[in-house]
Amino acid sequence: SETKLFCKFNREIERGTTLTYKPVFKENKEFVQCCYLDNRLGVWNALELCETITDGAIAFSCWEEHGGGTAGFLARFLYEKYNVSKALISDITWITEGVHHGNGVVISLRDTGIPRKIFVDQILAHAKESGIPFQTEVEGSGGSDGTEIQKIPYPIDWCFIGAPEDNVHTPAEKVHKKDIESMVNLYRYLLEKL
């Protein structure tokens, strides 16, 4: 069923006014649910990694949803200054026909951007040896900061890895706790191995 969103006011809203969803955080044994989980969980995962990372960089980008975000600039800076040539994109993907709640974090094999196969194969091999639950996706649309990194003239490998969510871009985005746990655990494992 399709959800309809609307604003009910006694006056007309001025064009260009920024509107946001009112956060109503819900949690049960299996799921967390709230607006903007696609942004919040990617950042939360990266912050969790700050507790254990010893050799690497964590960067926070913006404007990914609009294209032309800061990922390309950040990747260039990290490559030129610190010779960082591998990037893991910590974000949230969508529940689709082949991606389900509770089956683990999702390793994206491609979306509108196509990461280098040898790097993705390396990640898949590490994921298999880790024993951490994961699933894979192949998408023909959508994109991530990886797509922006792919467009810059630097040899930076990238891969999108994130928990899947339902009700994308609504006030009721929903993610399974097992998928969040496997996301954090796989990132920790990969940061040690890559």
Q: Over which residues does each language-model region extend?
A:
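N-terminal hydrophobic/helix-forming segments and targeting peptides
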Residues: 1-194
